[in-house]
């Protein structure tokens, strides 16, 4: 039962993350706002959403989790996956383009596997490894574009750091949850840390909002936050029940969901490569799920 709940949570986390990405792309197409401004607003609202959920479920909020030394792994994971990963991703796109960046950062599930085996002593089955390899191959082919770049090695370095940062989050969060932190508490620490870090960044760079905002923007932001928060909660449930390797492999199905939602809501054009690579990714997810 625990594994079935974890698998369902992992798959649904990908669905809601894909929906969130589609909404964010729509926001950026309509409004001239920086990703960091949206990230700050997102994290700020998500903190109160989490506090409300925790109060409803547990009747109180244990703020001592923020001073517990065992929470340090979540804080490190939040900094790696949030501001550091995001900055490196943006620099990689700047130097080598979005296609190559997406292809390189697609290895982050493999990073989770390696780190989980080394630091958590997790045993990873051959089917999980095969599934993750299929997913990475599918994403790589789907996003790769032959681009002439002058600063390839610099861009490659930033993309690789981004993949390592993203892959580290699930392992560090898993470690924290093995030390008596539940999923909601772990996620609350993550969001508070991420918000404060982004706040520092925009204090130096500015908020980056160069357009007038309206009620529609507010509605889209709320929809975006809700989608992402549902995804985060489900993802952390999957990490806690399945171990980082399998949870990451299921979560990365967001790539396919993003394509589906983009086709429905923004009219994304479909080609043979997109269909074939999506099927490869789905096959990889199926292999991971069928292990049970």
Q: Which positions does each model-derived feature cover?
A:
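Glycine-/small-residue-enriched transmembrane alpha-helix faces in small-molecule transporters
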Residues: 1-40, 148-175
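Helix-helix packing/entry segments at the starts of transmembrane helices
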Residues: 12-14, 41, 82, 86, ...
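Specific transmembrane alpha-helical segments of multi-pass solute transporters/efflux pumps
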Residues: 20, 58-99, 141, 222-242
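Membrane-interface helix-cap regions at the ends of transmembrane helices
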Residues: 26, 46-67, 137-150, 194-216, ...
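Transmembrane alpha-helices of multi-pass small-molecule transport proteins
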Residues: 31-84, 165-169, 187-206, 222, ...
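Hydrophobic transmembrane alpha-helices of multi-pass small-molecule transport proteins
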Residues: 50, 115, 124-144, 252, ...
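C-terminal transmembrane-helix exit sites in multi-pass transporters
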Residues: 54, 89, 109-133, 256-275
């Amino acid at each position: 039962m625990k594994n079935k709940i974890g698998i369902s949570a992992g798959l649904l986390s990908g669905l809601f993350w894909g929906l969130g990405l589609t909404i964010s792309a729509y926001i950026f197409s309509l409004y001239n706002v920086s990703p960091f401004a949206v990230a700050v607003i997102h994290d700020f609202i998500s903190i109160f959403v989490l506090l409300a959920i925790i109060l409803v479920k547990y009747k109180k909020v244990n703020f001592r989790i923020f001073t517990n030394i065992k929470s340090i792994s979540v804080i490190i994971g939040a900094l790696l996956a949030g501001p550091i990963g995001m900055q490196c991703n943006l620099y990689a796109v700047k130097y080598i383009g979005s296609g190559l960046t997406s292809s390189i950062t697609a290895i982050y599930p493999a990073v989770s596997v390696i780190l989980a085996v080394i630091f958590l002593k997790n045993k990873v089955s051959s089917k999980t490894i095969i599934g993750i390899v299929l997913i990475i191959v599918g994403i790589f082919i789907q996003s790769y574009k032959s681009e002439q770049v002058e600063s390839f090695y610099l861009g490659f370095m930033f993309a690789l750091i981004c993949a390592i940062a993203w892959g580290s989050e699930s392992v560090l969060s898993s470690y924290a949850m093995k030390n008596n932190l539940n999923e909601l508490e772990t996620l609350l620490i993550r969001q508070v840390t991420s918000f404060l870090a982004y706040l520092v960044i925009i204090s130096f760079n500015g908020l980056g909002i160069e357009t007038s905002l309206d009620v529609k923007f507010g509605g889209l932001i709320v929809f975006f936050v809700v989608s992402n928060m549902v995804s985060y909660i489900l993802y952390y449930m999957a990490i806690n029940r399945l171990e980082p390797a399998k949870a990451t492999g299921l979560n990365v199905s967001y790539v396919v969901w993003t394509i589906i939602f983009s086709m429905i809501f923004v009219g994304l054009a479909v080609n043979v490569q997109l269909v074939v690579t999506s099927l490869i990714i789905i096959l990889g997810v199926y292999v991971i799920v069928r292990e049970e």
